[in-house]
């Protein structure tokens, strides 16, 4: 199974991924934020670097799915419908089920989380400006998805997420 988390910065994607993995061990988490710092020790957060790491996430997704692993995509807003479609097609070409989780919350909640995590989040470019930049270009995807409002209680969100994955 391929589980894709998408949403604006600060909407709780990584938090929900950690909750999922705690409830359902065995998923291999691919995080662009983690991969970026692994392959680029001093990232500049350029479009070229982003594209390189996104391509790496896609390649690794295919590799892991080919080897029977369940994969969770984290650390990517996936604001581009085309990039989300690419991940869906990687799974579809392998006849692997895909679940898309779209994380949402109030803008003030996201901005508060971003401010709280300033300097400690693996994405060094994460900030208020990035939030609004991503928001301006965020595209809907044409695939079924579960929208999770992370302003709601965590227990109900995790329950809905686990039910959606069955």
Which role fits each region the language model picked out?
Residues 2:
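Walker A (P-loop) ATP-phosphate-binding motif of ABC ATPase nucleotide-binding domains
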Residues 5:
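Hydrophobic anchor at the beta1->P-loop junction of P-loop NTPases
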Residues 8:
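P-loop (Walker A) phosphate-binding loop of NTP-binding proteins
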Residues 11-67:
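Conserved substrate/cofactor phosphate-moiety recognition/catalytic segment
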Residues 52-94, 98:
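Glycine-rich phosphate-binding loop used to anchor ATP phosphates in small-molecule kinases
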Residues 92-114, 148:
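Conserved phosphate-donor/acceptor-positioning beta-strand/loop module used by diverse small-molecule
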């Amino acid at each position: 199974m391929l589980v894709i988390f998408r949403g604006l910065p600060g909407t709780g994607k990584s938090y929900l991924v950690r909750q999922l993995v705690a409830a359902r061990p065995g998923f291999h988490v691919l995080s662009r934020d983690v991969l970026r710092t692994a392959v680029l020790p001093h990232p500049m957060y350029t479009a070229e670097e982003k594209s390189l790491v996104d391509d790496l996430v896609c390649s690794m997704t295919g590799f892991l799915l080919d080897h029977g692993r369940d994969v969770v995509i984290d650390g990517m807003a996936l604001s581009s419908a085309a990039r989300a479609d690419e991940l869906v097609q990687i799974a579809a070409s392998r006849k692997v089920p895909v679940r898309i989780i779209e994380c949402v919350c109030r803008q003030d909640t996201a901005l508060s989380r971003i401010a709280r995590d300033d300097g400690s989040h693996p994405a060094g470019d994460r900030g208020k400006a990035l939030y609004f930049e991503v928001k301006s270009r965020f595209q809907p995807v044409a695939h079924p998805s579960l929208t999770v409002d992370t302003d709601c209680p965590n227990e109900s969100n995790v329950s809905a997420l686990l039910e959606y994955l069955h």
